[in-house]
């Protein structure tokens, strides 16, 4: 299936999502007559002026309808998508997602059966009308570069006057090593490329994005708030509880939404000091007492001049946005927070990645790839329909091109071109699939030779497991981690255990009768 996007953003309707329902995912619309409520919501949740036509809080993707409001492109504070550029950070070594990142960059890790993590920010950009995109890459970038080329340069996407450019870490005369030292340093090292491009394209604002998150967002609503607040920097923030707070950068705001303090992954007393007054959040979420912290989503909007000044002049020796630049910038720059209450999951660890994938199978799902108005894009594939032969399925994601025979699959994600043989049981597992098919004849020859074909052999039982691409798992194998081991390294045997989850390596072979 091929999608054609019209990315002409000079004019046209501006989409404002409306959602009915209870809980944190509800969007609270303001009544025209509720002036006091309007003022409180504007000040406490958005930190400044809001759109002249409709007032809303940005919420989740699970909404039954979309309201259209004509954008007033002639007004002074109108954010023009043609003057916005996006930078997607490819990440470092990806140590927390190892071993999934042993041969690929973090944004190239498969997710949701048929996507890659890079497809999330890329698709959000296109759906927001932003078509001038840079991707910073460094470690194990071959598969990432290949996926971007196949999907976005050959996939039928209409860029109009925009483009997607991959900027890979490279040697410079003044810095022969060439490696990025942090998120900010990756942009600084290519500032000469970006500065020339921004000048030529008349760019005003830059959206900086992460490549290891799962969410749906209209970035232009974030940019619109940034422009109306006349902020130097705007940080997209999500309300979180205490269990998640210490794992993220936290912001503290005043009643106008201005960021007073930014603290990267605080602990103990520092964590407690970052609590936000709940009356600041009560109009954005239903249970502000339960979510008293505001976590930075790693999504920032910078004025172009502010970003260039910070990286080229003011903080030339600082390398990271979260731990170094933003905590200092809040002291002498206008830094605003924009509260996002939709589904957002940082999948930068094995545990969070595993849980986010399995959550896709639940009903109702907190996150849904199926939205015709804001689709997610990935590489076009010419695959046959999945063949199911006497299978039992319960809460399962099954991708294209799979061959499943007399197996039982429950609460699992099955990637493209997966082969599961008769008598197999998969539960609470993520199977990423395969790059290519092995024909029945090829598989039979391998079995006769005592070898293992790609896929899962007969009568194998698997639970609580991630199976990377092209893995070969024999017959009568048991992978359940029955001893409850939390951490283990067995690369010579083709697997690791992280947070109690067994991870079968890419291209690994697990022989017949093995027990893990």
Swiss-Prot record:
SUPFAM superfamilies: Nucleotide-diphospho-sugar transferases (SSF53448), Trimeric LpxA-like enzymes (SSF51161). Keywords: Allosteric enzyme, Amyloplast, ATP-binding, Chloroplast, Nucleotide-binding, Nucleotidyltransferase, Plastid, Starch biosynthesis, Transferase, Transit peptide. GO terms for molecular function: ATP binding; glucose-1-phosphate adenylyltransferase activity. GO terms for cellular component: amyloplast; chloroplast. InterPro entries: ADP-Glc_PPase, ADP_Glu_pyroP_CS, NTP_transferase_dom, Nucleotide-diphossugar_trans, Trimer_LpxA-like_sf. The keyword Nucleotidyltransferase applies. Endosperm. GO terms for biological process: glycogen biosynthetic process; starch biosynthetic process. Residues 1-45 form a transit peptide. It is found in: Plastid, Chloroplast; Plastid, Amyloplast. Activated by 3'phosphoglycerate, inhibited by orthophosphate. Allosteric regulation. It catalyses: alpha-D-glucose 1-phosphate + ATP + H(+) = ADP-alpha-D-glucose + diphosphate. Its EC number is 2.7.7.27. Its main location: plastid. Pathway: Glycan biosynthesis; starch biosynthesis. Heterotetramer. NCBIfam families: glgC, PRK02862.1. Belongs to the bacterial/plant glucose-1-phosphate adenylyltransferase family. This protein plays a role in synthesis of starch. It catalyzes the synthesis of the activated glycosyl donor, ADP-glucose from Glc-1-P and ATP. This is Glucose-1-phosphate adenylyltransferase large subunit 1, chloroplastic/amyloplastic. The lineage of its organism: Eukaryota, Viridiplantae, Streptophyta, Embryophyta, Tracheophyta. The gene is SH2.
């Amino acid at each position: 299936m091929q999608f054609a996007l019209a990315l002409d953003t000079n004019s046209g309707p501006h989409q404002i999502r409306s959602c009915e329902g209870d809980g944190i995912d509800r969007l609270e619309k303001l009544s025209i007559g509720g002036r006091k409520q309007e003022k409180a919501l504007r000040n406490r949740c958005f930190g400044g002026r809001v759109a002249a036509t409709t007032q809303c809080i940005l919420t989740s993707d699970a909404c039954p309808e979309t309201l259209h409001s004509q954008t007033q492109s002639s007004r002074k504070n109108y954010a023009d998508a043609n003057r916005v550029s996006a930078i997607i950070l490819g990440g470092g070594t990806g140590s927390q997602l190892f071993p999934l990142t042993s041969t690929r960059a973090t944004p190239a890790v498969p997710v949701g059966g048929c996507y890659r993590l890079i497809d999330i920010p890329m698709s959000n950009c296109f759906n927001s009308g932003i078509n001038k995109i840079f991707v910073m890459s460094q470690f194990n970038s071959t598969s990432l570069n290949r996926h971007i080329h196949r999907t976005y340069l050959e996939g039928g996407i209409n860029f109009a006057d925009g483009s997607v450019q991959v900027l890979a870490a490279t040697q410079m005369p003044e810095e022969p090593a060439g490696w990025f030292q942090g998120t900010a340093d990756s942009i600084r090292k290519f500032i000469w490329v970006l500065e020339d491009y921004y000048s030529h394209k008349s760019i005003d604002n830059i959206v900086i994005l992460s490549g290891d998150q799962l969410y749906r967002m209209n970035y232009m609503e974030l940019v619109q708030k940034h422009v109306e607040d006349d902020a130097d920097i705007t940080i997209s923030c999500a309300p979180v509880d205490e269990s998640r707070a210490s794992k993220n950068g936290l912001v503290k705001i005043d009643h106008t939404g201005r960021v007073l303090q930014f603290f990267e992954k605080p602990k103990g007393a520092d964590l407690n000091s970052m609590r936000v007054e709940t009356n600041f959040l009560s109009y954005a979420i239903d249970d502000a007492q339960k979510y008293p912290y505001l976590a930075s989503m790693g999504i920032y909007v910078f004025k172009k001049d502010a970003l260039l000044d910070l990286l080229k002049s003011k903080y030339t020796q600082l390398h990271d946005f979260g731990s170094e630049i933003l905590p200092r910038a809040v002291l002498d720059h206008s830094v605003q927070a924009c509260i996002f209450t939709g589904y957002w999951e940082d999948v930068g660890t094995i545990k969070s990645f595993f849980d986010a994938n399995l959550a896709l199978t639940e009903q109702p799902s907190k996150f849904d790839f199926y939205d015709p108005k804001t689709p997610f894009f990935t590489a076009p594939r010419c695959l046959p329909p999945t063949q199911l032969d006497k299978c039992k399925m319960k809460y399962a994601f099954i991708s294209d091109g799979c061959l499943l025979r007399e197996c039982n699959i429950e609460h699992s994600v099955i990637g493209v071109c997966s082969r599961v043989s008769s008598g197999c049981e998969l539960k609470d597992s993520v199977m990423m699939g395969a790059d290519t098919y092995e024909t029945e004849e090829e598989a039979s020859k391998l079995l006769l030779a005592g070898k293992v074909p790609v896929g899962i052999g007969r009568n194998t039982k698997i639970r609580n497991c991630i199976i990377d691409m092209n893995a070969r798992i024999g017959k009568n194998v048991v992978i359940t981690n029955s001893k409850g081991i939390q951490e283990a390294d067995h690369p010579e045997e083709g697997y690791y255990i992280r947070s109690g989850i067994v991870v079968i390596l890419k291209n690994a072979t697990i022989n017949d009768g093995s027990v893990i």
